Amino acid sequence: MPTFSRSATVDWTGTIMEGTGTAKAGTGAFSVPVSFPKRIGDAQGVTSPEELIAAAHATCYAMVVTGALGRANASTKQTVVTCTVTADKTDAGIKITNSHLDVTATGLTGMDAAAFDKMAKEAEAKCPVSNALRGSLAIDVATKVN
C-alpha cells in the first residue's frame, strides 16, 4: 500500500483564555470550533483535541475490527465503537491518560460473544491510531454483543 498523509489546520484568534479557533480538515470534511475554556469546561458544541483524538481512535478501530470480522468469516448488522478519551488537569498542564474503546456488535453471525471479545481485543493491537497512542496513555477495550 502506498504511503499517504492527511492534514488539518487550526486558525486561532486571541489569547488562550479568551480566543477561539476553527479546526479544519485538509480534505474539507469538517470545520469545527475550538476554545480552551470550553476544552476544559462545558463544551457547549465546541470540540477539543481530546474529542478529535477520540473520533480518530473510534474510526480507525471500527475499520480494523470490521476488517477482522470479515477475515474470520463473521459479520454484524451493525458495529458501533465509542471511544472515551480521559485527561487530567495537572500542575504541568493537561495530560491525556486513557483511551477507552466500547465496541457493540449487533446481529453478530459467524462467531460467539467470547470469540468476538477475543478478536476485538486482538484487533486493538493492529489499529494504527492505537499504535500511535500506545506508550503515552492506557488503552482498553470492552465488548458487548446484542
Spans of features found by a protein language model:
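Extended beta-strand/beta-hairpin segments
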Residues: 1-55, 62-146
